């Protein structure tokens, strides 16, 4: 079943709104960060990674963002341009705000973490004036990253973008993307997340992220209750992730589709969600069946946790198909598809 119909005549497949960052991942990993001396620099930030992943699948991508007016701002902008991502709405901060920096600590294949520098941060300086009607009118879908809602003026910019998308019939994708370092208290998380989720056609997040979003609405829901609630608002597809236990897509016709992760020798514990988002959306835009979209997204996620970077090593579609074939030959079928009424 085709749950989402995109306006085929629009030039952009997807415009994203959210943070662009710079990741520093150690080359000499499997030791504490304080002992690492050599790092590789990559473009980072969840929506930025999704943008790169989608662009490598041949999708036409645009981006609303603010970045620092310095060499690191040049770095991320030029990387996007090389990937074929439109940067006409990525603008420089004017008051010295800096792009976020992320240092990765990889102690072992089972133990990794990040150290963030986000004081006076550039991405949350995105003002409503940067959000123009033409750009949103010309895209099939708008993806809002939840981190953009953490503070003004980015918060108002994101809400303006959602309002314009509703006016022009642009589909809205909400990637909850909770990052604790950006928020002041849990009430505002629930308030602003739920404002966007009520308008979204697709909602993607972990069980923990849904709990935060629903804290002021009805705490303690299970997945079925969460999906039913957001379907009653506007959502056609609700994806709830459970990490290594897999994820389930709940669709507006009462069906649910569950997929388990592909076995890999993971290097780090993050980056998978960004690959998942890019892969799932590519399948959806391609008109695939829901279980094929999920399988493809899950495969891309598995490949990303085994990779050193989250952006530069985003795989192309043919690489993911080859990975799926090889994995099934070795481990058997991964997808478990249930079609049960909710």
Regions found by a protein language model. Name each.
Residues 60, 64-144, 321-342:
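Conserved N-terminal subdomain of the carbohydrate kinase-like
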Residues 55, 81, 163-167, 197, ...:
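Anion (oxyanion) recognition and catalysis
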Residues 2-86, 265, 334-342:
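Glycine-rich phosphate/adenosyl-contacting loop at the front of the ribokinase-like
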Residues 141, 147-225, 245-246:
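Conserved beta-alpha-beta core of the PfkB/ribokinase-like small-molecule kinase fold
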Residues 1-14, 163, 215-342:
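Conserved phosphate-binding/catalytic region of the ribokinase-like
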Residues 134-135, 195-196, 231:
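Structural alpha-helical scaffold elements that stabilize or flank donor/cofactor-binding regions
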């Amino acid at each position: 079943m085709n749950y989402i119909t995109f306006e085929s005549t629009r030039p952009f497949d997807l415009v994203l709104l959210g943070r662009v960052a710079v990741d520093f991942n150690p080359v000499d990993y499997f030791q504490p960060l304080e002992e690492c001396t050599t790092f590789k620099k990559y473009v980072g930030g969840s929506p930025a990674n999704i943008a790169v992943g989608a662009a490598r699948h041949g999708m036409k991508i645009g981006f609303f963002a603010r970045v620092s007016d310095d060499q690191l701002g040049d770095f991320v902008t030029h990387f996007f341009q090389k990937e074929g991502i439109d940067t006409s709405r990525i603008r420089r901060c004017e008051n010295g705000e800096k792009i976020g920096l992320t240092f990765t600590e990889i102690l072992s294949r089972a133990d990794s973490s990040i150290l963030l520098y986000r004081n006076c941060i550039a991405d949350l300086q995105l003002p409503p004036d940067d959000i123009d009607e033409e750009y949103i009118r010309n895209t099939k879908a708008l993806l809002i990253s939840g981190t953009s809602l953490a503070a003004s003026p980015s918060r108002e910019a994101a809400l303006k973008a959602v309002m314009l998308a509703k006016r022009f019939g642009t589909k809205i994708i909400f990637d909850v993307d909770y990052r604790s370092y950006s928020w002041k208290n849990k009430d505002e998380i629930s308030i602003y997340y739920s404002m966007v989720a009520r308008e979204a056609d697709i909602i993607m997040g972990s069980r923990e992220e849904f709990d935060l979003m629903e804290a002021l609405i009805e705490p303690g829901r299970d997945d079925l209750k969460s999906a039913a609630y957001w379907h009653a608002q506007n959502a056609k597809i609700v994806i709830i992730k459970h990490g290594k236990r897999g994820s389930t897509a709940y669709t507006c016709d009462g069906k649910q589709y569950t997929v388990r992760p592909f076995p890999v020798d993971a290097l780090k514990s993050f980056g998978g969600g960004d690959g998942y988002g890019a892969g799932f959306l590519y399948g959806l835009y391609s008109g695939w069946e829901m279980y094929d979209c999920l399988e493809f997204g899950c495969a891309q996620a598995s490949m990303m946790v085994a990779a050193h970077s989250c952006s530069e090593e985003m795989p192309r579609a043919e690489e993911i198909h080859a990975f799926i074939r090889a994995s099934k030959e070795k481990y058997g079928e991964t997808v478990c598809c249930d079609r049960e009424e909710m």
